[in-house]
Amino acid sequence: KKKVPELRFKGFTDDWEERKLGELGSVAMNRRIFKDQTSENEEVPFFKIGTFGSKPDAFISRELFEEYKLKYPYPEIGDILISASGSIGRTVVYQGEDEYFQDSNIVWLKHDDRLNNKFLKQFYSIVKWQGLEGSTIKRLYNKNILDTDISIPSTIEQNKIGMFFEQLDDTIALHQ
């Protein structure tokens, strides 16, 4: 049985590979920030789960930000940040701004070039996270992410799919 979707872009015929996200990368998160390290008026926005994707209500010092950004995991431009508690699975594309994110509540998949971020963002919008079906637990653990199955085409096809849906999202946003 061929592993391909019913509907495809012209010119693509290869099978899609079945993988687990954990085979393609690892979960990364920022270093923990304690409440006494934040303020309402420092320089660098600190996003907690309640402000993720909107306006920050806490900030950290430039000095702490620069130190933690160098020493600990930090997203790269284009990485897809995921909320792991509250509204599980909400995503934000990291645009390269100086900002910091609440550890373990906001995570991203650190992966190699076998995965395209635009494709991954679309996958996140439809994924059924492994181990969460029917669960009352409102938490997405690293294991849930890493054990989740994903079907992936070639990176060229991933890019084409990702770009198509990004343009569709932009068009919809324009007309709202």
What residues fall within each predicted segment?
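Histone-fold recognition with a strong bias for associated Lys/Arg-rich disordered tails
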Residues: 2-6, 78, 131, 146-147, ...
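Loop/turn elements at beta-strand to alpha-helix junctions within RNA-recognition modules
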Residues: 14, 129, 154-155, 170
